[in-house]
Amino acid sequence: MGNGWHEWPLMVFTVFGQCVVGGFIVLALALMTGKLSREQEQRVVGSMFGLWVLMGIGFIASTMHLGSPLRAFNSLNRVGASSLSNEIASGAIFFAVGGIGWLLAVCKKLPAGLRSLWLVVTMVLGVIFVWMMVRVYNTIDTVPTWYTVWTPLSFFLTLFIGGPLLGYLLLRVAGVDGWALRLLPVVSLLALLVSIMVVVMQGSELATIRSSVHHASALVPDYGLLMAWRVVLLALALACWCVPQIRGRKPAVSLLGLAFVLILAGEMIGRGVFYGLHMTVGMAVAS
């Protein structure tokens, strides 16, 4: 019992991965609109470097969970049969296709037609990657606290909360602005509202889940307090993002960076609670 912080490598991997997928989708859609100049397009492509840095950090963290980086190769032994193998494989493919395509685009070796195909394929691979993350946890019927609709909702809501802000931040770094970007905070705000509903409904459901030795609600005694802190951090992040725009100003890049750090902190708290809720239907409860 606890708050799940012992699983911090997985927390970093899943939260960073979901935010990166969301951020890539934002940048890809910006490039595919055809409204950017060639110079702006090249700057946007260059800003994608930030995505791959975060994804690299996530994968490094995931190998720490395995105990040794060499074990990462063993985790691919059952692709197609194991949810864990599928998660690692789909993430590696997303990372490889996205990273190699990005390198070719930065070096101006990727024709316009192929670039559009690369963007679409990588977006699809990213969504598949997040879904494979969900399947690792949502297919274990002996863990009733994960075997619920709240698992896929929580994972994809992280994509919709953190992805738009990360994409907006990188677009601002690239010097791109426009009315369409004003819709991105709305996406994150709506996702936050849905996330709050999920927290409330999941919290009420925990009281009904029990094993032969434990109640689910006792796994993370501070569930309500931790989730309240999560919501506060996410709300502060959106305030840093939205308030300047409401006042008719562009948010400073430094302020957007702070907002993204707050998003990461909030989502890490939520993901820690998720791992802290691990329990089985038998006699044992993970410590």
Q: What does each model-identified segment do?
A:
Residues 32-36, 107, 172-173, 177, ...:
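Membrane-interface elements of multi-pass transporters and channels
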Residues 29, 57-60, 166, 170:
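Alpha-helical membrane-inserting segments
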Residues 265-273:
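Intrinsically disordered cytosolic tails
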Residues 50-109, 123-126:
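Long, hydrophobic/aromatic-enriched structural stretches that serve as scaffold segments
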Residues 14-18, 90-92, 97-266:
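Long, contiguous internal "core" modules enriched in hydrophobic/ aromatic residues
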Residues 1-10, 39, 63-85, 134-152, ...:
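Membrane-interface interhelical loops and short amphipathic "cap" helices
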Residues 1-57, 276-277:
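N-terminal signal-anchor module of multipass membrane proteins
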